[in-house]
Amino acid sequence: MGLKWTDSREIGEALYDAYPDLDPKTVRFTDMHQWICDLEDFDDDPQASNEKILEAILLVWLDEAE
């Protein structure tokens, strides 16, 4: 079973693992959306995301980066 948009914690952690040298404060949502869809374990409709979901994922990524 793959990652879904509702798995914000797991996706944020996966982004941190995939891009450890990237400062999440500099990331655009359009780029982050693509990176999430490109994650090997991601298995959800790319069009099902929204700003609230991306913000939740970004907050986890920021927390991991600190």
UniProtKB/Swiss-Prot annotation:
Family annotation (Pfam families): Fe-S_assembly
Gene Ontology biological-process entries: iron-sulfur cluster assembly
One term under GO cellular component: cytosol
Domain of life: Bacteria
UniProt xrefs under Gene3D superfamilies: IscX-like (1.10.10.600)
Similarity annotation: Belongs to the IscX family.
Functional description taken from the UniProt entry: May function as iron donor in the assembly of iron-sulfur clusters.
Known partners and oligomeric status: Monomer.
Name of the protein: Protein IscX
Organism field: Escherichia coli (strain K12)
